[in-house]
Amino acid sequence: MAEIAKLRESIESLSAQLGQRDARIAELERLLDESRRSGKRQAAPFSKASPVEEPAKPGRKRGDAHGRHGHRMAPVGPIDRELSAPLPSCCPDCGGELELERTAEQFQVDLPPPRPVVTRFNVDVGRCVGCGKRVQGRHAEQTSDALGAASSQVGPVAKSWAAWLHYGLGLSFQKTSALLARLGVNLTAGAISQAAQSTSTALVPVENSIVAAVNGSKMIVPDESGWRVGGESAWLWAAATTRATCYWVADGRGFDQACQVVSPEFGGVMVRDGWAPYRRFDKATHQTCLAHLLRRCDELISDLPAWARSTPRRVRELLSEALDARNLDDAERAVVVADLAERVELLADDAHPHDENRKLVAHLYAEREALFTFLAHPDVDATNWRAEQAIRPAVVNRKVWGGNRTWRGAETQGRMMSVLRTAAQQRVDAIDFLTRLARAPTPADVPPLFT
């Protein structure tokens, strides 16, 4: 009896130790996952591997055996200046007389010294003889009817450049102000912000046309990323299509926030990651991002013990076969889809060691109707790369200057980014578009963005 009691005591002790270790393992896995996610949010991602001890010398190798060596072509068009570089009076080595053999050409393309253009509008002011109403003239290049104390203004080209530098290239308002000052235009950071808000108001009809184009598309690719408004957490959303992209900042990342732009009645194809609120667009045909699933498989293969790696390997193999099937004809793809769908069902029925594997398989099964849409519709993307590319510049901007101070600024942020990104997709010069917008005397004269 004493021996049995001792064994029971030993078993209880070991069970307690195993319980503590299981809890510790779960905590370490949570910290690892949190660390991995945090690493993706850093301004400077960590390197993928240790530096090579003897890296290859940068640049192209010399000689014709290493392919064509590119060079800058001579400029086409009129030459603005011609300068001569005559021979020196004598040989710099021995002092001997020099004989001219030929005159060669060298070209240099450079920026001219910055000089702002100052325009004075001579505005005629009159009064109607019949009703006494005051009337004044307006030139096509004017952006305002203000006279008197408000008669000196910064023109639309400079303001459009400022908007493009801040919302398009990610310069802060302060740096944008400094750059414009170097070009001869004095515009404070506050004035740039106010000008952007004024432009944003004029862009409401343009934004509405972008939203309509997004919802009228056959395929929408949405994504969201963390944002800041007034130092508080918010979310930047993007909905990308082949023709237009819409951005908006919201106070959350749920279904209601997504519906601020994407209609809940959208009936096209939605290519998105596995975030659950996207599934509530029940009128849409869904395609979940396979790249996210493959990355998760790679993480599990790297993190899990050897005895638990078979499940993520099976999932990775299944998804890789699906991607490889894109080059097959319609009939062959249909056969592959049926086979892969059956394998997903079998995978869900199997027992899987380790909680993380069970989570992976449960998620895969929940997404089973959205795994292989791209094989049934070849014009559908298999990943949400469009949205990730669309949202990446904004993420860089957030890491540079932190987000927006006010919700009005956040509204301007989304609207300006939508116009700039869509203009690029439409091959429209964004600066020229914003300039023409500023000069439009009425909303009816706003230039079209879509070609």
Residue ranges and their predicted role:
Residues 16-19, 88, 121-127, 132-451:
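Catalytic center-proximal scaffold of phosphoryl-transfer enzymes
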Residues 1-150, 222:
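Short, flexible loop/hinge motifs at secondary-structure junctions
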